[in-house]
Amino acid sequence: MSYLNADHPNGMSYGDGYLQGAGSLGQVVKIVGDDLFAVNIDSAAKSFGLLIKDYASGDMPGIYCGGGIYTTDVFTGSIAAGDALMAGVDGKLTKQTGTNPQIATAISVSGGTLKFKLLI
């Protein structure tokens, strides 16, 4: 089972909108309309935060945002400490490529666990 621990969170949003389409714990979301969020599968799009659990389409999601330190096993690709992270094509954290917006910085990766600083 996947996890996302808020080790030192700065903010959480709940009750600020609804989810368009389903989303899973740890996926990156973006704003797609008034009070409407969706999983961000476009690496170039501006991200808003991370889902705190699994949600169905139409649910009012909890979203970690506003920075903080987190640990998770929800990420893709090879990441090293110090890497800039972005939203990947699957909506998960991945190593930043090109000029895509950075949303987090990797602090450590060990045993399938990523510790990172959220910048959004």
Annotate each predicted stretch with a short phrase.
Residues 1-120:
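Surface-exposed, low-hydrophobicity beta-strand/loop segments enriched in small/polar/acidic residues
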